Amino acid sequence: MPAAIVHSADPSSTSILVEVEGMKCAGCVAAVERRLQQTAGVEAVSVNLITRLAKVDYDAALIEDPTVLTTEITGLGFRAQLRQDDNPLTLPIAEIPPLQQQRLQLAIAAFLLIVSSWGHLGHWLDHPLPGTDQLWFHALLATWALLGPGRSILQAGWQGLRCGAPNMNSLVLLGTGSAYLASLVALLWPQLGWVCFFDEPVMLLGFILLGRTLEEQARFRSQAALQNLLALQPETTQLLTAPSSIAPQDLLEAPAQIWPVAQLRAGDYVQVLPGDRIPVDGCIVAGQSTLDTAMLTGEPLPQPCQVGDRVCAGTLNLSHRLVIRAEQTGSQTRLAAIVRCVAEAQQRKAPVQRFADAIAGRFVYGVCAIAALTFGFWATLGSRWWPQVLQQPLPGLLIHAPHHGMEMAHPHSHSPLLLALTLAISVLVVACPCALGLATPTAILVATGLAAEQGILVRGGDVLEQLARIKHFVFDKTGTLTQGQFELIEIQPLADVDPDRLLQWAAALEADSRHPLATALQTAAQAANLAPIAASDRQQVPGLGVSGTCDGRSLRLGNPTWVQVATAKLPTGSAAATSIWLADDQQLLACFWLQDQPRPEAAEVVQALRSRGATVQILSGDRQTTAVALAQQLGLESETVVAEVLPEDKAAAIAALQSQGDAVAMIGDGINDAPALATAAVGISLAAGSDIAQDSAGLLLSRDRLDSVLVAWNLSQMGLRTIRQNLTWALGYNVVMLPLAAGAFLPAYGLALTPAIAGACMAVSSLAVVSNSLLLRYWFRRSLNHSVSV
């Protein structure tokens, strides 16, 4: 199966996804990115710790075989393979180690911890089990813990050290290995007078495995939205094998066979029973029913459908059997596009993550340096300057007396080396680059998933962060603030031509156009039962109009300046109506007056934005009087309107606003909005808009409702706040815990950490970041119920 390769506009530039297994912290991410960026031909790299994916842009002329990328990653000690499928509906959400295996390792570690602790408890209760109070027994338990449940962690840590890319696992290896080796030396050479603490590796690995198991479960829950989307795609369907030989009226009862959805092709006929989900985008050829389309449109009520209606994959058939002719299947369906958009959004990094990446890239080296300095200081100067610390057992530290096999709270008065080693180990294991690495991607993962549930498709974490900072919203008028469903209210002939013929010419010029004004003219011609006529040499100029030839006449249809009748005396109409002018080479022929209505939610959305301190403007190609009339209906001042603007001027207007220091969000739907959408800091397109507008936007509102703008803005601000909370926690944790573990508070307050307690703190730190990101779901849903609905 070919790898999932996407070619860009540049024929030599290619993007590919690489699945990377074994990354545990931001240090791992930094190591993979650094190694790939050093590979000749690689142009850009983005690695996501949560999804375990690396997106690599490379020059295909320099890298003919992309497997060299996986070889580079494997050289760091990680498992890597090219993603083998580009259909987002058939892909796993993330390469997460099987929880069943992880739980088994945790269970073994917990058993070893209980047995180890039982030896101590039995001694305290004067009922020790035979042998459990002996050093060799605890040495055996520690060995089992290292070679059993802790083996994968230690192997990954060693690979990182060996390849010059130390990571979180490397810190655990150094910490547990140091404790184990020191205890082993004390056991084998008791004459040295060292003490043993074999329990520390057992307790440390137990806490780390517990934290990672809980963390993986939390990560899995953080992808709930993507899981829900994937669940909408059925695995099998009922395929009609010979539909061409079946009469249309018999299709509903025709025999069908179970068929994998992944093998469906355009043109196939499928039967969809009540209670089944539709597997393809297509057209109903037999039957009528009701559909649950809430997944795509947000409409809570069932929608009726009949022959000729188009349906989308993932929608639920509620009442009667349907036969559907497939038009788009697999990765071409609208559902697949939504899943792909969400997955790509979760892969793209937010700018705020660069800060965490800059720290995490060298974090492990810094921790190792601090641990070495801690050991050297307390083994020499520290114990001399503050000898009283040698009389204080570290809280929670249980040490074995080497000569008697008995446990005791052992003072450190004769062993500065033991104190130094214990504190150095604590430094190694308390440090948490995982929290730094998880702070941003987990929040983005949850936020983009929540957005998808609300019908908001976000292109990436960078878009989400930028939207949170927006304070200036610019709306297109037609089809955005208005419903885009124009009605022809008057034809005003300005030459001796029959009005019906004028309408036929206008409809012919606008044939095949999706613009709302064009649709209104075509609808009016059909309603008048006017026969369609052909137009030749049609040429559309976005934002101005269309030209062509009808009945031998060279015609222009559009705004008055473009049809070159600016010097003519133009008739006036309703201030709220929109005019389209028709002219030939000689004269102005007609004026068509059309009227649109504001969206029902438009006024409330505009006022809600303004009440929260945002500036709202209207940017329209329509005439000034029409745009101002709409603004007044929405409660806006006429000064907020910029009208009669060409598409390129829209982009210039957005650029001018942003040059004043304002980050601007542009909301539009048409071809003429595409330049402005691309120029704005955040472009927002409605689902009913043109493909060009959607491609130019950073956000797509698939439910085609303006109140989704409010929802997206609110969610982006909550997401950015969660990211800042996570980063503050991750940085604050390390700033506080590293000095505590290094013994900075030991002389004055007698406070320090044992390695086991340090390991528990490290596990809790990562879990806290993931849990805080998951809380975003709760706070967001609560906000929907209280302040966002309009």
Curated annotation (Swiss-Prot):
Catalytic reactions on record: Cu(+)(in) + ATP + H2O = Cu(+)(out) + ADP + phosphate + H(+)
One GO CC term, this protein: plasma membrane
Principal location class: membrane
Entry keyword Nucleotide-binding: yes
Residue ranges, Cytoplasmic side: 1-105, 157-163, 220-358, 439-723, 775-790
Subcellular localization, as worded in the UniProt entry: Cell membrane
Gene3D superfamilies reported in the protein's UniProt record: 3.30.70.100, Calcium-transporting ATPase, cytoplasmic domain N, Calcium-transporting ATPase, cytoplasmic transduction domain A, HAD superfamily/HAD-like
EC number: 7.2.2.8
Extracellular topological segments: 128-136, 185-198, 382-420, 744-755
Membrane topology recorded in Swiss-Prot or TrEMBL: Multi-pass membrane protein
Recorded superkingdom: Bacteria
Membrane-spanning residues: 106-127, 137-156, 164-184, 199-219, 359-381, 421-438, 724-743, 756-774
Binding-site residues for Mg(2+), renumbered to this chain: D669, D673
Domain (HMA): residue spans on this chain: 14-81
Family assignment from sequence similarity: Belongs to the cation transport ATPase (P-type) (TC 3.A.3) family. Type IB subfamily.
NCBIfam families: ATPase-IB_hvy, ATPase_P-type
Descriptive protein name: Probable copper-transporting ATPase SynA
Source organism of this protein record: Synechococcus elongatus (strain ATCC 33912 / PCC 7942 / FACHB-805) (Anacystis nidulans R2)
